[in-house]
Swiss-Prot record:
Name recorded for this polypeptide: Multiple RNA-binding domain-containing protein 1
Principal cellular location given in the protein's record: nucleus
Keywords: Nucleus, Repeat, Ribonucleoprotein, RNA-binding, rRNA processing
Listed GO biological process terms: rRNA processing
Subcellular location: Nucleus
Gene of this entry: MRD1
Sequence similarity: Belongs to the RRM MRD1 family.
GO molecular function, one term: RNA binding
Lineage of origin: Eukaryota, Fungi, Dikarya, Ascomycota, Saccharomycotina
One Pfam assignment: RRM_1
SMART domains: RRM
Length: 828
């Protein structure tokens, strides 16, 4: 965890004093952390404002937090000895309960015990056999009511109706209600009619037929007449007097519906509030309702993050949440005044179930020294979004334009990053040659397409040279990862100036840099803040500009490896500056026409460092090598921890990059055998991460180039003129179909490998007859018959493995792994 708990603080210490204590590090290199790594400081206080003498300190990473524990534990603040330990989250089962939670649980247990006691008493009461006498209270033989009851139940012919009339009248005389004049006001109101009395009798019969769980209510209903039977048992009371006692006075003008409702309420009150309770309290087996937070996340697939570090970056959250599923968007609002995060963010998942998994796993967890608070996010507001119904009412061309503009923001990869407007290319070449565009291409010439392709190749070479001088890593365009701050602006008309591009994009935010080559065919715009760049991309993509339409593309990451963005912190820039393409070709080397076949000089060289301590971090490795000349960046290779999601483990080795091969060799000699964190380092020059061109060049022993995506209209003569401009061709072959049409690819073989390399770099991305040429080195021809037979065997083995894989897939065994390369196949 990256959050520490500090106990036994002095009672006068506040947040500023606690931060000052943790910032007093004499040697950050040996301590393993720096004061800038502190992300949060909090002293816990009671409701009256007094300190509870403990607090929390957050750090940027787990490693720095562990180093701070070792450094500050059992240290002193003035004369008070403090205790420092790693803090636990609320979701940790080992966290002790607070006093308030313990009291709440104790009260809950008491309520549950009382409920259990009531249920037990009720069960014992229901198990005891009961008689009608017990229910009516007539089980006692000395009870005078029993005698009255037996006398009343005798056969009328045998009973002496005059026997006890006087005694009963005397006994019950206090209960007789004398009729007075005030009773006359009730004569105008009728009591319950026969129908209502019948309904009451039906309800009583239904209540008597209820199940065992309603026996208690039935008992109470039967006891009600016993309480009021003093008046009913008095033979001197007339039926009218008894009826008046049960009448309810009704207000004048009261509707009949209210009268019935009031009658129902009074009836339920007479039965102690349980007359209608059984129907409402009937237990129904219902499924437990789902957490509303989960329901909301399932609808939107969006999470709202709070309590974030103000210097946090979007990449931090992409790395944290990408382990749960594909991310559609990570939005980190930026304060335009400070250039820092506002303390909250939005994460949009493609699959809502992945968002639920991320919420359950990360809510309440510690991230960058702070407690991460996750809430369900509201759907993203898109005021310009049109649904299918609105699109149907628009013309087809407008529909396609809107859909293409909506998909542009989601596009992560383009096949041709250095695409240029063909008209702008021809204008640029004509201007550089001092002629008109119409004079550059003869419409009557048969090789006009070849001339146009050569002109484009020339402009591409100039653009590459310009970007190389500006510090742009050309090989980064082959990377799939995109940087939202970088926008490639293409397809604008010739004559567009750099101030015009800057003015157009500066409306959406502060710009860091705008680069446009002298050819004026492409531009690179870099924003300071990601949200501003996204807004500009969404508004300007496929927007009409002058006489053309703007094509925008998100630029690659690490476009400027040796330059940091102003909005980034130094430590983060060092991580972003890691270049994974050592031994890469510079633009000047690519355009070199020398006859020497030696490999081009490298722009930077990496040193492979192994036998690292698993606790050694990239910061510690950087501190060990940064004093050497030519040092660029150091990185310890990490891998995800399978046991702890979101954490990484060191692989025991790393790489240190230097600006030149000479500096790397000097560092190897100086640091080989150096002891770091108790481990003796072993160094050697690394050749990792070569770009695609260098890798293909090493494989190309022969000087043959495979040309893909060749237009079907292109002839062998066109290929010879186009590729012959960059060297001496040995052979050119354009395979054809049975009807003499081109098959869409060709082969061009040069006299030397250097000429093939020159043509490969110059024509990569060039268009011929509207098609972008895709070039790669072809496999060298077999030097003898045995080598040719081996290649044929490998091809046949691969085809057989593919057929076997297809058969197993049809048979339901598609999950079995098959060696499609034929490395383990038996020889023929």
């Amino acid at each position: 965890m990256s959050r520490l708990i500090v106990k036994n603080l002095p009672p006068y210490l506040d947040e500023a004093g606690l931060k000052k204590h943790f910032s007093t590090v004499k040697d950050p290199k040996s301590a393993g952390f720096a004061p800038s790594d502190i992300t949060d400081v909090k002293v816990v206080r009671a409701r009256d404002g007094k300190t509870r003498r403990f607090g929390f300190v957050g750090f940027r990473s787990d490693e720095t937090a562990e180093a701070a524990v070792k450094y500050f534990d059992t240290s002193f603040i003035n004369s008070t000895k403090i205790s420092v330990a790693v803090a636990m989250t609320f979701t940790d089962p080992n966290v002790p309960l607070s006093s308030r939670e313990r009291k709440r649980q104790a009260a809950q247990r008491a309520r549950e015990d009382a409920e259990d006691d009531r249920e037990a008493k009720k069960a014992r009461y229901l198990e005891k056999p009961m008689t009608i006498d017990d229910i009516n209270g007539l089980g006692n033989a000395s009870d005078p009511r029993l005698a009255d009851y037996l006398d009343a139940m005798q056969v009328r012919s045998n009973a002496k109706t005059w026997a006890n009339n006087d005694a009963g009248a005397v006994a019950n005389e206090p209960q007789v209600i004398q009729s007075t004049a005030s009773d006359d006001e009730y004569d105008e109101f009728t009591g319950k009619g026969d129908d209502e009395i019948d309904e009451d009798e039906d309800e009583e019969e239904e209540s008597e037929n209820k199940k065992d769980d309603d026996n208690e209510e039935a008992e109470e209903d039967e006891e009600d007449p016993v309480i009021e039977d003093g008046l009913a048992a008095d033979p001197g009371v007339s039926d009218m007097d008894w009826l008046r006692q049960r009448q309810t006075r009704i207000k004048e003008g009261e509707p009949e519906e209210d009268r019935e409702n009031r009658h129902t309420e009074s009836k339920s009150e007479g039965k102690k509030g349980k007359g209608n309770a059984p129907k409402a309290a009937t237990p129904v087996d219902e499924e437990p309702s789902e957490d509303p937070t989960i329901v909301s996340i399932r609808k939107t697939g969006r999470l709202f993050l709070r309590n974030l570090l103000y210097t946090a970056k979007e990449e931090d959250f992409r790395q944290l949440f990408s382990q749960y599923g594909e991310l559609e968007e990570v939005h980190l609002p930026i304060n335009t005044k400070t250039g820092q995060c506002k303390g909250f963010a939005h994460v949009q998942f493609e699959d809502p179930e992945n968002a639920i998994a991320a919420y359950e796993a990360q809510d309440g967890k510690i991230f960058q020294g702070r407690l991460l608070h996750i809430l369900p996010g509201k759907p993203k507001k898109d005021y310009n979004r049109l649904d299918e119904h609105d699109l149907k009412n628009l013309p087809l061309k407008k529909q396609q334009e809107l859909k293409r503009k909506a998909e542009a923001a989601k596009q992560q990869f383009s096949w041709n990053s250095l695409y240029m407007n063909q008209d702008a290319v021809m204008e640029s070449v004509a201007k550089s040659m001092g002629i008109k565009k119409s004079e550059l291409i003869d419409p009557d010439s048969s090789d006009a397409a070849v001339k146009q392709a050569l002109a484009e190749a020339t402009v591409i070479g100039d653009v590459k040279s310009y970007f190389e001088k500006m510090g742009v890593d050309l090989a980064s365009f082959d990377n799939k990862d995109r940087d939202d701050r970088v926008i490639l602006v293409k397809n604008f008309p010739f004559g567009t100036t750099q101030p015009e591009i800057a003015e157009m994009f500066s409306e959406y935010g502060d710009l860091y840099k705008v680069m446009m080559p002298p050819a004026g065919t492409i531009a690179i715009v870099i924003f300071k803040h990601i949200p501003d760049a996204r807004a500009a991309f969404a508004k300007l993509a496929f927007r009409r500009f002058k006489t053309s339409i703007l094509y925008l593309e998100k630029g690659p990451k690490n476009l400027l490896p040796n330059e940091k963005m102003e909005s980034d912190e130094v430590e983060h820039v060092k991580q972003d500056k890691i270049v994974t393409i050592e031994d890469k070709l510079s633009a000047s080397d690519v355009m070199d026409t020398g006859s020497n076949d030696e490999r081009p000089a490298t722009a930077s060289t990496s040193v492979f460092v192994k036998n690292l301590n698993f606790k050694t971090t990239s910061r510690v490795l950087t501190d060990a090598f940064k004093a050497l000349d030519g040092f660029l960046v150091a990185q310890v290779k990490m891998k995800p921890d399978s046991k702890n999601k979101g954490k990484f483990l060191s692989m025991g080795f790393g790489f240190v990059e230097f600006s030149s091969k000479e500096a790397a060799e000097i560092a190897q000699k100086a640091m080989d055998g150096h002891v770091l964190d108790g481990h003796k380092l072993q160094l050697k020059i690394s050749n990792r991460g070569q770009d695609e061109e260098t890798t293909e060049t090493k494989k190309a022993i022969d000087s043959k180039i495979l040309i893909k995506n060749l237009p079907f209209e292109a002839t062998k003569k066109d290929v010879q003129k186009l590729f012959g401009a960059f060297g001496s061709l040995k052979t050119v072959r354009v395979p054809k179909k049975f009807n003499s049409e081109s098959r869409g690819f060709a082969f061009a073989e040069y006299v030397s490998a250097k000429e093939a390399e020159h043509a490969m770099s110059a024509l990569q991305g060039t268009h011929l007859l509207g098609r972008r040429l895709v070039l790669q080195y072809a496999q060298a021809d077999a030097s003898n018959a045995e080598e040719e037979i081996e290649r044929m065997q490998a091809t046949v083995s691969k085809q057989a493995a593919q057929r076997s894989f297809a058969d197993m897939k049809l048979a339901g065994e598609g999950k079995r792994r098959v060696d499609l390369e034929g490395e383990d196949e038996e020889e023929f």
